[in-house]
Amino acid sequence: SMIDAKITSFDTDSKQENYDFGDVVLERCVSYYRGLHFTACLEFMDIPVINKFDVANTCGNKMITSMLLKKNNIPTPKTYFSFSAETALENFENIGYPLVIKPIIGSWGRSVMPVKDKDTAEAVIENRQVTDGPQDRIYYLQEMIDRPPRDIRVITVGDQAVSAMYRKSSGGFKTNIALGADPE
């Protein structure tokens, strides 16, 4: 059955037997933060969840994910982190253009953009300084990879790839299906 996290509530005395969630919950909240904290509540009650809190917390944060991929010798674009607007601008200048800036937390390609020159870098950094999100004060920059207009999404269970698809750009920089890319 379907559980709507938006209308479900818990407290510190909540017990598994008070809910009819079945044997395991497949967490698929659209909101990362809602899903993460909903998972924490379910795990608090010893309800098995896919994906577990630790997995969702790690994979939902691009900075942590990038560091773990690197630590495990998985090739990724060169990635830079900085924690102030000034240092981010210095990184742009020292590393050179083009780079891609991404929010450390986010999905659907939102706020992911190529930065090809100093004027664009300054505008992007200035825009992030007026937002209220604390994660916007962490600057995640990646080298821009010259690649075909597609990426590959792979679904794994344990160490086994069980499904994969190309996501082909519909003419832009991003290959996200929510933004119009075509699955194949």
Where is each model-derived feature located?
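Phosphate-binding site of ATP-dependent enzymes
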Residues: M113-E184
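Short hydrophobic/aromatic-rich motifs at helix boundaries and adjacent loops
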Residues: L36-T39, C59-N61, N94, Y166-G171
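Active-site nucleotide/adenylate-binding loops and adjacent lid/helix of ATP-dependent enzymes
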Residues: N18, E43-D46, N51, A56-Y140, ...
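Conserved residues at the C-terminal ends of beta-strands
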Residues: R28, S82, R167
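Surface-exposed, flexible loop/turn segments at secondary-structure boundaries
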Residues: Y33, N57, T87, V162, ...
